[in-house]
């Protein structure tokens, strides 16, 4: 009798079980459970990559807000003042500037305050 797909099937099983090799219990040993868990893990990895972008933006905004409040302003007024001043720095750069170069960041806050006062 001819054996169909034996090499391909074995390779496919081996690939799934290799990916599942740190999972708890039967999820790392039984093919059906391992396949289900690997699929679920790939879904979580995909959504995690998307969610990471939102989390970083939230972190940057929190850092900017904390630094701006030390200067007597809040985040939304600061961003509004920068927009009125035609200063286009993204939130990542503003966050880094607030941490690494507080003097330059203070100058930006002063520019934003002047733009709001007008």
UniProtKB/Swiss-Prot annotation:
Keywords: Ribonucleoprotein, Ribosomal protein, RNA-binding, rRNA-binding. GO terms for cellular component: ribonucleoprotein complex; ribosome. It holds the Pfam family Ribosomal_L20. Transmembrane segments: none annotated. GO terms for molecular function: rRNA binding; structural constituent of ribosome. PROSITE patterns: RIBOSOMAL_L20 (PS00937). One of its GO terms (biological process) is ribosomal large subunit assembly. Gene3D superfamilies: 6.10.160.10, Ribosomal protein L20. SUPFAM superfamilies: Ribosomal protein L20. NCBIfam families: rplT_bact. PANTHER family: 39S RIBOSOMAL PROTEIN L20 (PTHR10986). Binds directly to 23S ribosomal RNA and is necessary for the in vitro assembly process of the 50S ribosomal subunit. It is not involved in the protein synthesizing functions of that subunit. Belongs to the bacterial ribosomal protein bL20 family. This is Large ribosomal subunit protein bL20. It comes from Elusimicrobium minutum (strain Pei191). The lineage of its organism: Bacteria, Pseudomonadati, Elusimicrobiota, Elusimicrobia, Elusimicrobiales.
């Amino acid at each position: 009798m001819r054996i169909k797909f034996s090499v391909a099937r074995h390779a496919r099983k081996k690939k799934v079980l290799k990916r599942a090799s740190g999972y708890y219990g039967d999820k790392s040993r039984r093919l059906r459970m391992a396949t289900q868990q690997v699929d679920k893990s790939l879904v979580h990895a995909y959504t995690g990559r998307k969610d990471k972008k939102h989390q970083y933006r939230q972190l940057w905004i929190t850092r900017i807000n904390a630094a701006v409040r030390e200067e007597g302003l809040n985040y939304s007024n600061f961003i509004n003042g920068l927009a009125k001043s035609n200063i286009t720095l993204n939130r990542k750069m503003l966050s880094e500037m607030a941490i690494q170069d507080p003097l330059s960041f203070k100058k930006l806050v002063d520019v934003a305050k002047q733009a709001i006062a007008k």
